[in-house]
């Protein structure tokens, strides 16, 4: 039988411990739950390993996270950590994307200081409404925190640069020109200029 190395085993034990504590969240205060979630959120973002797959695709646990999110709707720190946890569990480990999970992401799309964490993962969910694709994308750059919102929007522009609808190209180019002007190094300025050229060439 293959021996799991100690480093991996320690991570497995930590994930199991945090999941077990969160499964029994009713025994803890709001602050204690928030602290547990802050620790757990780091685990699906950590280096991917086959050994973690069964833990991160546990739908029963994901549903408990949704239950916690519903109970503490006004706690943005809790919402952010749950959105990040579930998003990474889906994208990195293949957690089943249920209607309840998708609806939870949609509910938080435009919540101040929370919506940007939705934007990191929502475009990659299977149920993402393609007809509102670019209408939603164009709103991401104006979310808060500003730096994270602009980085997320820039990543999306990069991934879909040949698909930008004509009606949005002017606004995207204006955003890129502003980023270019604010860039304090030649490499950054060249990067934004190349993106602009790519968009213009597609017209």
Residue ranges of each PLM-predicted region?
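Short, Lys/Arg-enriched, disordered terminal segments
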Residues: 1-23, 181-186, 200-203
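Alpha-helical solenoid scaffolds in large eukaryotic transport, assembly, and signaling factors
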Residues: 6-10, 22-81, 85-98
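Amphipathic alpha-helical scaffolding segments comprising HEAT/armadillo-like alpha-solenoid repeats
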Residues: 15-19, 49-69, 92-106, 128-139, ...
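Helix-loop junctions that connect tandem helical modules in alpha-solenoid scaffolds
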Residues: 17-30, 65-76, 104-119, 139-148, ...
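Amphipathic alpha-helical elements of HEAT/ARM-like alpha-solenoid repeat scaffolds that form extended
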Residues: 31-51, 77-90, 113-126, 149-162, ...
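Alpha-helical adaptor scaffolds
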Residues: 83, 87-92, 101-145
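Extended alpha-helical scaffolding segments
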Residues: 119-120, 125-203
């Amino acid at each position: 039988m293959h021996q799991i190395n100690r480093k991996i085993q320690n991570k497995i034990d930590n994930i199991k411990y945090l999941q077990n504590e969160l499964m029994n969240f009713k025994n803890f205060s709001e602050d204690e739950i928030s602290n547990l979630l802050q620790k757990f959120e780091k685990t699906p973002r950590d280096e991917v390993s086959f050994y973690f797959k069964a833990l991160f695709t546990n739908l029963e646990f994901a549903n408990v996270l949704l239950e916690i999110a519903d109970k503490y709707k006004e706690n943005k720190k809790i919402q952010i950590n749950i959105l990040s946890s579930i998003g990474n569990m889906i994208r990195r480990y293949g957690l089943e994307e249920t209607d309840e999970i998708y609806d939870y992401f949609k509910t938080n799309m435009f919540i101040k200081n929370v919506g940007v964490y939705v934007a990191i993962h929502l475009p990659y969910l299977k149920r993402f409404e393609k007809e509102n694709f670019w209408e939603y994308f164009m709103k991401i750059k104006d979310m808060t925190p500003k730096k994270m919102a602009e980085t997320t929007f820039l990543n999306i522009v990069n991934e879909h640069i040949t698909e930008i609808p004509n009606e949005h190209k002017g606004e995207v180019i204006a955003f890129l020109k502003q980023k270019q002007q604010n860039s304090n190094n030649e490499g950054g300025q060249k990067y934004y200029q190349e993106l602009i050229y790519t968009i213009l060439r597609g017209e």
